[in-house]
Design a protein with these regions (language model features):
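Catalytic core of non-heme Fe(II) oxygenases with the double-stranded beta-helix
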Residues: 119-120, 144-237, 276-285
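Non-catalytic surface loops within mature trypsin-like serine protease
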Residues: 140, 200-202, 270-272
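Catalytic metal-binding/acid-base residues of hydrolase active sites
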Residues: 137, 151, 216, 250-251
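Conserved double-stranded beta-helix
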Residues: 219-251, 255-344
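Non-heme Fe(II)-dependent double-stranded beta-helix
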Residues: 1-30, 37-174
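Short hydrophobic-aromatic micro-motifs
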Residues: 36, 198, 244-246
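A short, structural micro-pattern
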Residues: 130, 190-192, 260-262
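A structural signal for short, well-ordered beta-strand segments
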Residues: 134-136, 196-198, 266-270
Length: 344
């Protein structure tokens, strides 16, 4: 009888919150996620939460807030096919996303290089990795449940030699590859991205904590995107200050907030260095932030070369700096003959 991998079912074992690197790595291997207690101490938690709410309120006041998860909004569509004003309260948006937090406070930037989380990210991605996005989700009451998805949907699946491969540039967000029992003999991709979700208030079943499908990282498949979900998932429950780390192959989605208050999550997404980040830091970073950034932060923002990739000139430079005098078209002072001698 052929062995198979069954999807997680409600009531099956799940990780317990912990403060152990060893336990966290074990959880990541088996379940695809782990919950770290007290990732933010009390003072840091208050500082991050207050700065986030101040920024969020200011963006609403300025008319630039990104508001989604309304009943008639569908973020699974290709973003470049949607009008720019799709995600606003006027168009039914309920939750508020705050993007590009790297520019919006030192308390946010400090999380990019979190000392406890870094070894766990390195376990998944290796010693070289990039920040893909640093953002927040303020999930308000009334927001609808998000369809399940993975955060490395852009990875082509391993293909048998006799099948035509999927061209990488044709892959679309929200493609459905199937579910159910999984043949363990079929090859799957490694994790190439991961998420650290910092809980800025308690995540509960009632307020729509992120929903995950434990062990789905081993399926090698994209999840069915239906809402309500057609597979068993679990809403994350964690105390304020905790961090939920889950890898990029995990099936997950924002839960619906049925409480009477907002749920505040700050999400740091990382990817391997050969992949394109969601946020373009080399172009979008505030010059003052860049000038003050540590070498470690600059590396995670994509300013450090990786095996000569990301260069703007010399392939053996370590970091790229904004060129004040970029080299453009040049001609020698003299004309060169075919023999290589200069004409007088």
């Amino acid at each position: 009888m052929k062995e198979s991998i069954s999807l997680w079912q409600t009531g099956d074992p799940v990780p317990e919150p912990n403060r152990s690197q060893e336990q966290a790595i074990s959880d990541l291997r088996e379940f695809g996620y782990t919950i770290i207690e007290e990732a933010l101490d009390a003072d840091r938690l208050v500082a991050v939460r207050e700065r986030l709410m101040e920024q969020a309120d200011a963006e609403i006041e300025a008319g630039i807030a990104f508001e989604d998860q309304g009943a008639d909004q569908n973020r699974s569509k290709q973003y470049d096919r949607l009008p720019v004003d799709t995600f606003t309260a006027a168009n039914g948006g309920v939750n508020q996303r705050v993007w590009m937090l790297v520019n919006k406070g030192k308390v946010f930037r400090d999380l990019v290089t979190h000392l406890f989380m870094t070894p766990l990210i390195e376990f998944l991605l290796g010693p070289h990795f990039l920040l893909s996005t640093l953002s927040a989700n303020i999930a308000n009451p009334g927001g609808v449940e998000m369809g399940l998805h993975t955060d490395q949907w852009w990875m082509p699946r391993p293909m048998p030699r006799n099948e035509a491969p999927v061209t990488p540039g044709s892959i679309e967000r929200g493609e459905y590859y199937g579910s159910g029992d999984v043949d363990p003999a079929r090859l799957i991709n490694p994790p190439c991205a991961c998420n650290v979700m910092y809980c800025l208030n308690d995540f509960t079943a009632l307020n729509g904590g992120t929903r995950l499908v434990p062990k789905s990282h081993l399926t090698g498949l994209q999840p069915p995107p239906d809402v309500p979900h057609t597979v068993s998932s679990i809403g994350m429950e964690a105390k304020a200050g905790s961090a939920i780390l889950f890898e990029g192959r995990m099936w997950h989605g924002t839960g619906a907030n049925r409480s009477n208050g907002p749920r505040l999550g700050l999400l740091a997404t990382y990817c391997a260095p050969q992949f394109r980040a969601q946020e373009n830091y080399t172009l979008g970073i505030d010059p003052e932030v860049r000038a003050e950034a540590s070498p470690e932060l600059l590396a995670r923002l994509g300013f450090k070369l990786w095996n000569s990739y990301g260069r703007i000139g010399h392939p053996h430079a370590r970091y790229v700096n904004e060129p004040t005098d970029p080299i453009g078209e040049m001609t020698p002072h003299g004309q060169r003959q075919a023999t290589g001698h200069m004409l007088p």
